[in-house]
Amino acid sequence: MKEYQVYLERARSRQQDFLYPLIFREYIYGLAYSHNWNRSIFVENGGYDNKYSLLNVKRLITRMYQQNHLIISANDSNKNPFLGYNKNFYSKIISEGFAIVVEIPLFLQLSSSLEEAEIIKSYKNVRSIHSIFPFLEDKFTYLNYVSDIRIPYPIHLEILVQILRYWVKDAPFFHLLRLFLYHFCNWNRFITTKKSISTFSKSNPRLFLFLYNFYVCEYESIFLFLRNKSSHLRFKSFSVFLERIFFYAKREHLVEVFSKDFSYPLPFFKDPNIHYVRYQGKCILASKNVPFLMNKWKHYFIHLWQCFFDVWSQPRTININQLSEHSFQLLGYFSNVRLNRSVVRSQMLQNTFLIEIVSKKLDIIVPIIPLIRSLAKAKFCNVLGHPISKPVWADSSDFDIMERFLRICRNLSHYYNGSSKKKSLYRIKYILRLSCIKTLACKHKSTTRAFLKRSGSEELLEEFFTEEEEILSLIFPRDSFTLRRFYRNRIWYLDILFRNDLVNDE
């Protein structure tokens, strides 16, 4: 990020802190290219086309200003008749430029806030997305009720842009951003359908995620205020790093809205045991108290989205369940609280008592059905989980084919090693292992049985030991009790920064 600071200081000295001129800087697109090229992907490493011209980008922006009276809908051809260039390709280039430009000043504000709060070191320790599970194991065993909430999408992208305007004050920049969304994202509708937003998020992932994260950050800031008003306790693990422009005016308006809808003031409902966890567009709300207070929080969320962000949300989409009877899905895991009952005989003098002890344990397991569905979509097996060959990889060498399957198998094993039950993980390994053998047999135009007999199945299957198993097998014998016990225990890795591509929370 030192490159960001150098480029931003240079641009500030020349352009007096405006973001709009940065759109026409070539190093901005170089940073965007470097970000996409170096980002690690779990399943397959995809390239990024670097055959772009800054001159063509400038011409396209100029043409957008000159032809702003024309409506270029999503049904138009990929070739713009006025330019002769691929419209979809250059729209992605410009969206990358927008995303990288607005990220620069906000990242510097975030870094300075983190340094002032002196939490840089602790922040680096919890960068892994798996660091959330030790928190769940520590807190959720004492809770009784849970609500699985899907954060609704805005009905129009203009809502996301307006939220961004509270942070960045640059009228030309936002004029160009709106013009871009109008021309290339079919923004000439009063209501943007979910399909249109999904299409935009896939074609412009970085820009959409940036706008969406602003929307989530805004709603969570207000939620933090409500939570502090409803509890004597304060968040110690959460900080508002950036200044909230117009936040106090919004807060007063929000209190007025809630005071009209509820007959009791917010401080009346004290809930010190509320816990909130979110990843991307899904959040988990859990509490120890009665469902009445959880139901109040449910209505707070609905009124917040509908009255403050103009986002429609139905009350029936948010369910409140007992944690011991309901599993919630987060980051590709199914989690629930299991009750372990044990009977202890206690004797006092000549009287004997039987005492039933109930202990709670958080079970975190691999969702086998969604994972098999993802493997079937990637053509590793059918919908029933039966392994099949992958003919599209048959043109590669034997080493490359095995290396691809090994990479996927190791990444899945690395990601799901925190599971309480490893049986489902072993089944996934078996599917990938047999799919690899079938692919190699298909390449050599042989049956699976004949290929295994000719190549030696033991040596081939030995390659599918994960890196952790290989290291541990050098320390402990493969048939030792210590090694088998270590395999059964949960292991959380703090180096996982991205969710696996085969993981699906839907």
Curated annotation (Swiss-Prot):
Gene name, Swiss-Prot/TrEMBL: matK
Source lineage: Eukaryota, Viridiplantae, Streptophyta, Embryophyta, Tracheophyta
Annotated Gene Ontology cellular component terms: chloroplast
Subcellular location: Plastid, Chloroplast
Molecular function as annotated in GO: RNA binding
GO biological process, one term: tRNA processing
Identification of the protein by name: Maturase K
Pfam families named in the record: Intron_maturas2, MatK_N
InterPro entries in the cross-refs: Domain_X (IPR024937), Maturase_MatK (IPR002866), Maturase_MatK_N (IPR024942)
PANTHER family noted in UniProt: MATURASE K (PTHR34811:SF1)
Known function: Usually encoded in the trnK tRNA gene intron. Probably assists in splicing its own and other chloroplast group II introns.
Keywords, ordered alphabetically: Chloroplast, mRNA processing, Plastid, RNA-binding, tRNA processing
Organism: Trifolium subterraneum (Subterranean clover)
Similarity annotation: Belongs to the intron maturase 2 family. MatK subfamily.
